Curated annotation (Swiss-Prot):
A GO term, aspect molecular function: calcium channel regulator activity
Stated family: Belongs to the small GTPase superfamily. RGK family.
GO cellular component, one term: plasma membrane
Keywords (A to Z) from UniProt: Cell membrane, GTP-binding, Membrane, Nucleotide-binding, Phosphoprotein
Subcellular location: Cell membrane
Chain spans, region Disordered: 1-107, 283-308
Residues where Phosphoserine is found: S27, S295
Regions of compositional bias (Acidic residues) in chain numbering: 1-13
Domain of life: Eukaryota
Record-given protein name: GTP-binding protein REM 2
Species assigned in the record: Homo sapiens
Length: 340
């Protein structure tokens, strides 16, 4: 009798020694123990480490996810649903277009259908009014918009082909150190140098602006159009139509007069810019691109630096008198934006 009691007491003592003091009460069946939780955690960490070492190619631009960030929704799906790791993050829609200067390169097919036009020139000549007219804004005809936008994008039909035309009006906005202007030079497909026919000073700045454009992109055959704006102000005119065309012929540019206030020739201007871009691209693809400076067929690089103002004055003073007949003939076609 005493032997059975002693045996039961010995078994209880051994059970108490094996179990911790705080876990004497039996847990319900199916409840995970701390040891099981630790095992599952180690397995998860091991699986993540194996995925990191597997060398799976990640999608370009995929952000690194911290442990505190939520798991993407697609990874919360049931295990029965197949999920491709390369599907995240989602790719950008091809129907969108680039609206900023610092965007990345587009696909070739998309890039061919997007034309970026830069409005450049002195302040007060009507660049913002031209941009607003292109964007379809209805503003005061006597003043420029008080709060103009920076960029306008529209899809237009030119010669039975639909294109996306983006017009930038950022030449003077917060240009500390000229960084923004230099960025414009590297981004635009065509440049519209706007001057006011009522302000001769803005007209005299055109050669300097053009030289800056060509100095920033010396290896590119960029279309440039001289735009004489405010042609409706006949009594205040200081620059004649003949002077504008003559300067355009001298500088190998196109010329057009517009009135942004009356929407005169504004449609012809932007459609002509698209045609000029197409013509230049077609000529470059056909092998008719200008030779690079320094090559046997191109001009020699300048030996020393010279200010843009001096270059403009020397350029006009040397070329116009000797080749006046040539420039007169060239100026006759400078207003036709459908030909080179």
């Amino acid at each position: 009798m005493h032997t059975d009691l002693d045996t039961d007491m010995d078994m209880d003592t051994e059970t108490t020694a094996l179990c911790p003091s705080g876990s004497r009460r039996a847990s319900p069946p199916g409840t995970p123990t701390p040891e099981a939780d630790a095992t599952l955690l180690k397995k998860s960490e091991k699986l993540l480490a194996e995925l990191d070492r597997s060398g799976l190619p990640s999608a370009p631009g995929a952000p690194r996810r911290r442990g505190s960030m939520p798991v993407p929704y697609k990874h919360q799906l049931r295990r029965a649903q197949a999920v491709d790791e390369l599907d995240w993050p989602p790719q950008a829609s091809s129907s969108g277009s680039s609206d900023s200067l610092g965007s990345g390169e587009a696909a070739p097919a998309q890039k061919d259908g997007i034309f970026k036009v830069m409005l450049v020139g002195e302040s007060g000549v009507g660049k913002s009014t031209l941009a607003g007219t292109f964007g379809g804004l209805q503003g005061d005809s006597a003043h420029e918009p008080e709060n103009p936008e920076d960029t306008y994008e529209r899809r237009i039909m030119v010669d039975k082909e639909e294109v996306t035309l983006v017009v930038y009006d950022i030449w003077e906005q917060g240009d500390a150190g000229g960084w923004l202007r230099d960025h414009c030079l590297q981004t635009g497909d065509a440049f519209l140098i706007v001057f006011s026919v009522t302000d001769r000073r803005s007209f005299s700045k055109v050669p300097e602006t053009l030289l800056r454009l060509r100095a920033g992109r010396p290896h590119h055959d960029l279309p440039v159009i001289l735009v004489g704006n405010k042609s409706d102000l006949a009594r205040s005119r200081e620059v004649s139509l003949e002077e504008g065309r003559h300067l355009a012929g001298t500088l190998s540019c196109k010329h057009i007069e517009t009135s942004a206030a009356l929407h005169h020739n504004t449609r012809e201007l932007f459609e002509g810019a698209v045609r000029q871009i197409r013509l230049r691209r077609g000529r470059n693809h056909a092998g008719g691109q200008r030779p690079d400076p320094g090559s046997p067929e191109g001009p020699a690089p300048p030996a020393r630096r010279e200010s843009l103002t001096k270059k403009a004055k020397r350029f006009l003073a040397n070329l116009v008198p000797r080749n006046a007949k040539f420039f007169k003939q060239r100026s006759r076609s400078c207003h036709d934006l459908s030909v080179l």
